[in-house]
Amino acid sequence: MKLAFLVHTSRDYEEVIEMINQLTKQGDHVFIMINDNDLRDKVAFVYTDYLRVHVSRTQEYAQEGDLSLARGTIIQMKEAIEKDDFDYFINLTDGMMPLKSRSEIVAFLSEHEGKDFYYDATADYDQVVLNKKSKKYYPFTNALDFPRNNFLRSLSKASGSFFSMLGIRRKSEE
């Protein structure tokens, strides 16, 4: 069974390297989006010749609270499908590692073949904080240059906070 781990991180160098090494140790692939430019370059350099590590370059940055993380994950999946035929994608957020061994993960996925699994983070996360972040309106995140342009990212955060103070929020049906 071919597994692809989709990761978004802004951790320090040692943690990122250790995570990648652990995830690729048993032959799995890692598609990683790193928010820090210097860290991204260091990791890309270290794994230049390692075919199982793919540092995201199409979208290099994702901001919490807007759709750039969802878009980045979809781009990672698209790039993964173009490289190989993966059976499952496992999405990990910053600092996460699988608690089960690869054989236990494969056995579980084989037993429940064709089903999707997800973890509802709202059970462990302060609902007020989550609602505040999800309702904040961040402009410019659909701009093609958003992931690479520090000015646009900063302007988006500042505008989001300003709009929030004015009571302008993202509309949601839920």
Label every PLM stretch briefly:
Residues 1-174:
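ER/Golgi luminal nucleotide-sugar-dependent glycosyltransferases, focusing on the catalytic module
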